[in-house]
Amino acid sequence: MPHRAVTFTGIPFENPFLLSSAPPTESENNILRAFEAGWGGVVTKTIGLHPVTNVVGAKAKFLRTSPDDASVSMKKRPGAALHSSWNWELISDKPLDWWAPRLRRIKEAFPSRVLIASIMAGSGNDKELRNWQTLARACQESGADGLELNFSCPHMDRKDMGSNIGKDEGLCSVVTEAVKEAATVPVWCKLTPATRDMVVEAAACFRGGADAVVSSNTFPSLPMIDPETLEFEINVDGKVSSGGLGGPAILPMSLANMARMTRAFPDRAFSGIGGVSDFSQALNYLLLGCGTVQVCTAAMLDQAVGPRVIQKLNAGLDAFLERHAADGWRTVDDFRGIRRDRVVLQSEIRRPDASDYEGGYEHVEGYAAPVIPEGYAPPTRAEARVS
């Protein structure tokens, strides 16, 4: 008999699928609806000490592509397929004092479901580190099963928050360590893809004591410009700032980032996020080594909390385990990470005839052939400039 249940960072989940920190998890009612729908866990909208003020107008929209001309636009039109989501929403506009009693009520209503509190404060001084600790203590005392540190929002209105922490390995380590000093529950770090190498920041989080890394948040991006009006498709008074791109378009990039991290830290815990709407996509993250998978965009388009999405995910997992019963697979752990080591350096991919391959170097008659170290990868342009 197949089992959906997993244990991740010491927390038992009824299934490995979570609704991620985003607009769908911004209210008590939505989180309760998500648990009623069957999600194994929910990560709250990011909680801060004080309320924030979002921009006027739309905070998020969806980009669609037309099969006839392949255009990508936020405009709704017949036959267009989902391409991605775009948002420039900040963290929760409700302060910690608003969230604390609601966390308690949610856990009382669903004691067996996993409630993760996403939190964020600033960085760069001891006061902000204490703010992280205050948030951690309040959320865990209110019933949160774990904490997710938001090091990844790409468009915060303060320079010492969000992805600006996630781009700095020193801050990743220091903030994580400060939270771990106060935490009695597992601590996850949610990283930004907007960095040179996420392995570096993941390592910093683990040095700080992180129990897991979540990858990744949305990719920094701009909305499209309407070719007729020459205005950004989402703007305020004609102006726009960078926002976050999510949904199907980021799936391959998110998988590549995840593969680098799970290969670097095969014995560590990872939660995958980015571009998932059904089990076949979630399976990619599990096969690369993730213990849980989070969903946002697909849920937003399905009654805000994704009742049909979680049904498909659970049904897909059940069917997959049944198909592989002869392989002895009964749980996610039986197949988790079995494709992680298939991701290798490009130089390790077989050529039609290895004797003809010079590793990208031209063989010049009269000169000795270059000695190419095993596993060598040519430097990027940026690396070449630095050297």
Q: Over which residues does each language-model region extend?
A:
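Glycine-rich, positively charged N-terminal anion/phosphate-binding segment
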Residues: P2-T7, S27-F110
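N-terminal small/glycine-rich loop or linker at the start of catalytic domains
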Residues: R4-S21, K59-A60, P78-S85, I106-G122, ...
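Active-site mouth loops of central-metabolism enzymes
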Residues: F13-S27, N87-D93, I116-W132, W188-R196, ...
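Alpha/beta enzyme core
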Residues: L32-A37, G41, G122-S271, S280-V295, ...
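Glycine-rich, proline-tolerant flexible connector loops at the mouths of alpha/beta enzymes
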Residues: T46-K61, G79-K94, L147-K167, N217-M224, ...
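C-terminal helical cap(s) of enzyme catalytic domains, especially alpha/beta-barrels
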Residues: P51-D69, L222-G243, L286, A298-R330, ...
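Active-site beta->alpha loop and helix N-cap motifs at the rims of alpha/beta catalytic domains
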Residues: D68-E169
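Extended, intrinsically disordered, low-complexity segments
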Residues: D68-K76, L251, A259, R308-S387
